[in-house]
Amino acid sequence: MQKIRKGDSVVVLSGKDKGRKGEVLKVMPKDEQALVSGINIVKRHQRQTQTQEAGIISKEAPIHLSNLAIADPKDGKPTRIGFRVEDGKKVRVAKRSGALIDG
């Protein structure tokens, strides 16, 4: 089971966006990276195609999972993740507050 999943609210721990929060758009476990909305924005020079115009577009670039931490559901600060079995299901738990992350 992954600690960071699509739809999670995360906090950036290091890099140019340190301290900023965003939502995970996509997780790439093989590369140990994730796309986070509004984080690690890069400019891409787009060539003209039949459907798109030429120009410079901004888009999110992947960020390594080690630079992300789940935002605690209670106070929004970065927390580590633990696992617990409740009602026969494995759920994620915030180590900081003990709050469940999976509904």
Swiss-Prot record:
Regions that span the bilayer: none
GO CC terms, sorted: ribonucleoprotein complex; ribosome
Any GO BP: translation
Superkingdom field: Bacteria
Cited InterPro entries: KOW, Rib_uL2_dom2, Ribosomal_uL24, Ribosomal_uL24_CS, Ribosomal_uL24_KOW, Translation_prot_SH3-like_sf
Gene3D superfamilies, per the entry: 2.30.30.30
Keywords carried by this UniProt record: Ribonucleoprotein, Ribosomal protein, RNA-binding, rRNA-binding
Pfam families: KOW (PF00467), ribosomal_L24 (PF17136)
GO molecular function, one term: structural constituent of ribosome
Complex formation: Part of the 50S ribosomal subunit.
Function: One of two assembly initiator proteins, it binds directly to the 5'-end of the 23S rRNA, where it nucleates assembly of the 50S subunit.
Protein family: Belongs to the universal ribosomal protein uL24 family.
Protein name (database record): Large ribosomal subunit protein uL24
Source organism phylogeny: Bacteria, Pseudomonadati, Pseudomonadota, Alphaproteobacteria, Hyphomicrobiales
